C-alpha cells in the first residue's frame, strides 16, 4: 500500500509539473490524485477509522479553503472599488528594479502581521497595476512569494506553523522575533538582489489591463478609501481575533467579509439612481473568485493528508531521528521537504517526534548537549520555524503563497523551477548560516 501511494503521489506531482505540456489543468490532476490516494488507503489499509480520519482531515483543509475564499473576496472587493490605487499612487518610483526592492520590503513586513496567502493576494493585485508584461510579473510575483514566506517565518502570527509552535509553547514570541529577525531578511535580500539582474533598469509603463477595476458611477475616492480601510482593517482583525478568542482564523476572516459585505450593501442601497448591473456587490464579485485555485489547493492538501494518515510522515521523522541525530540537518531536510509537502503536517510531525524538553528531562538525559536543542526556545525550534517557512519558497507549489501566486498569475511550475528555485535556495542556506553564526557567537 505504501509503495502504491508513493507512486501515485509522485506521478501526480510530475503531471502537475508538466501541466503546461499536458494541457490539463493542475486542479483536475490534484483532485484525481487526492481521490486515488484516499481510495487506496481505504481499500488496502487496515484502519477501520479511515472514514473518521477523512472527515477530520477535510475539516482541517476546509478551514484553509474558507480562509482563502474570504481573503480573496475581500481583496477582490477592494480592487474593484479602486482601493489599491490609494497605495499605488503613493509609490512614486517607476524604476523596475527599485520597485522590486520596494514590493519585496513591503511584502516582508506585511506578511509578519497578515498571513502569507492574504499578503500575496494583495501584493499581486498591486503588481498588476504597475507591471504589464507577463514574464516580468512572474519574476516580481516570485520574489513576493519568497518575501511573504520569509516574513511569516519570524513572526509568531505570520504563518500557520509559527502559530502552532507559539501556541504549543515550543517558542516564545519575543525570542522568536529576536533570533530570526536577521536570518529572515537575509533569505529575502539575496534572492531579490539576484532577481534584479533579470529585470531591466528602466521605468515601468503599465498598460490598461483587463483586470483594472471598473468603478461604478458616483463611487469616488472617498468610498474607495472606506472600502480599503475596512478591508485591510478586517484582514488585520483576523490575527487579533485568533489571539483573543482562540477560535480558528477562518472564522475571523468570514466575520470581516460579512462586515464589508453589509457596508457595501448599505451604500449601494442608497444609490437608487444607479443601475443594478454596474454595482459591484459582493454577490457579483464572488463570481470572479478563482475557483480552480481553490480546488487545486483542496486536492493538494487532501493528498498530503492521505500520506499523513498512512503514517508516512511519522515514519520518515523516525528515520531522521535514528540515522541523522543532528538538529541542523534534520531541520534543513524538513525545510527542503516543505517545498514538496505541506509544511503544516511536517512541523506537526516534528512536534510529535520531539516534545519540548523540561529541566528534569534535560538533567537526566544521556545526551544533554543534543537534548538542549529541544528545550523551549531551543535552537531546533527556531531552525524548524525558519526552514519550514522559507523552504516552501523553493518550489511554486511548496507554500500557500506560491499556490495562490501560481493561480492568480498562471506561473508555470517549470519556469519557477528554472528561474527562481536556485535563488530561493541561496537565500535559504544563507539564512541557515546566519542562524548558525548567531548560535555560535551569541548562544
Q: Regions from the language model: what does each represent?
A:
Residues 162-173, 233-247, 436-443:
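Transmembrane helix-loop junctions at the membrane interface of multipass transporters and ion channels
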Residues 5-77, 86-94, 250, 254-302, ...:
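Hydrophobic transmembrane alpha-helices of multi-pass solute/ion transporters
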Residues 81, 90, 103, 234, ...:
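Transmembrane helical segments that form the transport core of multi-pass membrane transport proteins
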Residues 6, 31-32, 65, 100-105, ...:
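Hydrophobic alpha-helical transmembrane segments
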Residues 6-18, 33-42, 68-76, 107-108, ...:
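Hydrophobic core segments of alpha-helical transmembrane domains in multi-pass membrane transport
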Residues 59-70, 175-191, 245-258, 330, ...:
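Alpha-helical transmembrane segments
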Residues 8, 133-138, 142, 154-155, ...:
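Juxtamembrane and boundary regions of transmembrane helices in multi-pass small-molecule transporters
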Residues 37-47, 58-59, 110-147, 151, ...:
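Membrane-interfacial helix-loop connectors
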